[in-house]
């Protein structure tokens, strides 16, 4: 048989063959070593089930005045986007979808239904189906028994399609033409329609095919028109869209939510137009949970699919399907025939007699109430103890059960032990569908196993019995510890494959969850859900004390601590009369601002002892965190964690450098074997690089002029959060505390106001400068004492500030890096560039710099470029600090304030020059009143002049002992002290004398490292190096 004929003749087999081919392709890709998990394993086809779903939703959307035209138009655009998928499909594929839809719509009714049942994926496949059908009708004797669709592949169409299926069943073409055989759908479709959420029974939908006996209202005369039958079924099904469980799995969470919203909106619109009617089961399921609570695979009856079942067989198969399902609250329905007498449970009688009464009614009506009790188990009088033990959870021993219904209360089941099992409000509302009774029986059966000791489930590996299936599954997991899933990248093992899939996202950098509003991607669904709250503005966590709402639970907990701190401080006045534990004393001291622990070296105080131990690492140079890969040590855990991420990125780069997907990526433009770049975020305007994206965003505010932080007290804007916090502290200092220690109303600052006073009690004894904290005074005194507490452990060099030590230690780290890589990987780079302090060379003049930013600023001298431009007046500057100082003119901001006179200045250098006046005035006050400080200096200079009484050597020694006259030996004091021994020429400075002696000695100490030429002056060497750089 040709392939096209075979696909047309056996559409179900063709569809399942295509699915198996896709699964084999995906499995083959996973087994391949070059398979990249980042790429989606799901194939993109032209007619995916999700696309068909949203196509039907797009075509069947109804306009309603309550929604409004704008909302309806936006809903149509969203449905069309999910149907045509312009972000995935090409223009040709989108056109193919539109052409296929129009082609199917212009086909005759019988042909359209037949082609839709075969689910073609393109127009050519639909034409092939019609051509094969035409050949069969022209003269072949082959008869298609009908497409035996599997529930996982069959597409549940719209209400119009189901009406056409019903029409095709009653059509005379079934018996008079070969096309009728092709149009004959199997009975499983109608049974599945009923099980997928239809409120009518299959027998009610097919009255002519499956007549029932015993109920006069169920008989349908042959003369009854098909139009009347269709009018009875024209309800919510006309705008309803249903689908199989496999198709539901193809949809993501956004598509499922959109489907649920559209179905509920169509139901509300129909209810407002038609009037009140019975709520369909699909709507009930959508309001409760997902519409697919059933496994439709069990709905497929075995046997010959060609033979149409009778009404009894179909009812028996339906009952058997329902009884074999797990007890889900939203999955079962209770169907009662409209023509049968109402079945009810008598009040105050036993449940056993109630079921027997229902069994007797079965002889009169073949559609009894369906409950979760097997048909053969309804006759409880024939049950034995042995049978009950074998049946397990599916049997009910109703010996001690009474069905109670008290007027004004809910129904309940009562056990012999006195425990009641009541019907909840949700089940009570839907008790006419059988949910309430099923829920009571299910809960009662679980309780009954406790008394009877039934172990209805399987035995575990160790022989232990479990009464509940969930307990059995949990017990089996203890014996499957040996079965583990190992990560191929890092070797970590997991007990479940789903945990391994989540873990591998860390290596693949996959971000599968995307925000529907702004498009931002996330690695975890919880982070995406938390991010979407920003757009919706939902703040679910509300404080019951001040009614303030928060978006995150962590922020809510921090806010609750502020109330607890206020309460603790109120109780603090009674602290002497109460006995607290040491832990509470420590906690209360932390909240009240007490610093009980001091550092023995710098006298800095802290709240708790652990902070002191961490602080002392600065003095001891202890670095307890050591990297096992590069042997690098760190003082803080945060720096160690940030460093380990670099190794992870380097490992990820090495693993993927040979993959095709990463070869074409611009991120892999580095040479093979190169280490991971620490600074990966580049500023496009100034070229500065950063290690974090947040730091880059903060840096770009310099160019854009954005100031997102605004003070609520004075309205001033700030570009950085740190500057904003410092500014807010000034307002907190101005506020006066009321009634003892209290807290500011601002939640940003949770420190007592009493610690923010204008007093600066710590004063320097040498220069008179005052400070607020004692630690600041100790740091300041290093300027006078010359203390350098920060010492390099490798070379012994000492520094006054820790920042200078960190900058110096980079030299040693670069030296180690150069020793490891040698010069083979960087053959064109000189060793002194890697190991020296100045690593960045200017291509114009040959000058070197320690930082790349300084080099870029220096290049502006040659090019005349001024990169920093003011957005308000358009003035440009070559340095960033000059632009910042200039912008304060527009904002009238003067952040630098003199502590003596209160005068404010724009720049720090202006404040420094102003403070020198106060310093000179303070020194003049301490000096004798007869003469000023300048006169005193002149007098001391005159005393230190070299003369016959005081030789030159004694003059130099006296000058070196004076802290105020350090550079006196280089200042002209009337005589040139430095004399040349050869020619007798004298100079003011010794450096001038050394340079002069080179004329006599012909010394050329400056040598070019490239050509070997020597020079007497360094300026000549720098000028000579420019020639090599240009060449």
From Swiss-Prot:
Pfam families xrefs: KRAB (PF01352), SCAN (PF02023), zf-C2H2 (PF00096)
GO cellular component: nucleus
Alphabetized InterPro entries for the sequence: KRAB, KRAB_dom_sf, SCAN_dom, SCAN_sf, Znf_C2H2_sf, Znf_C2H2_type
Residue span, SCAN box domain: 55-137
Location(s) in or outside the cell: Nucleus
Segments of this protein annotated with the region Disordered: 1-43, 911-939
KRAB domain: residues covered: 234-304
Zinc fingers classed as C2H2-type: ranges: 485-507, 513-535, 541-563, 597-619, 625-647, 681-703, 709-731, 762-784, 790-812, 840-862, 868-890, 896-918, 978-1000, 1006-1028
Principal subcellular localization: nucleus
GO biological process: epigenetic programing of female pronucleus; negative regulation of gene expression via chromosomal CpG island methylation; regulation of transcription by RNA polymerase II
Presence of keyword Metal-binding: yes
The keyword Acetylation is annotated on this UniProt entry: no
TM ranges: none
Sites of the Glycyl lysine isopeptide (Lys-Gly) (interchain with G-Cter in SUMO2) crosslink: 317, 374-375, 399, 567, 654, 736, 758, 938, 956, 975
Role this protein plays: Transcription regulator required to maintain maternal and paternal gene imprinting, a process by which gene expression is restricted in a parent of origin-specific manner by epigenetic modification of genomic DNA and chromatin, including DNA methylation. Acts by controlling DNA methylation during the earliest multicellular stages of development at multiple imprinting control regions (ICRs). Acts together with ZFP57, but seems to be the major factor in human early embryonic imprinting maintenance. In contrast, in mice, ZFP57 plays the predominant role in imprinting maintenance.
Family to which this protein belongs: Belongs to the krueppel C2H2-type zinc-finger protein family.
Name by which UniProt lists this protein: Zinc finger protein 445
Annotated organism of origin: Homo sapiens (Human)
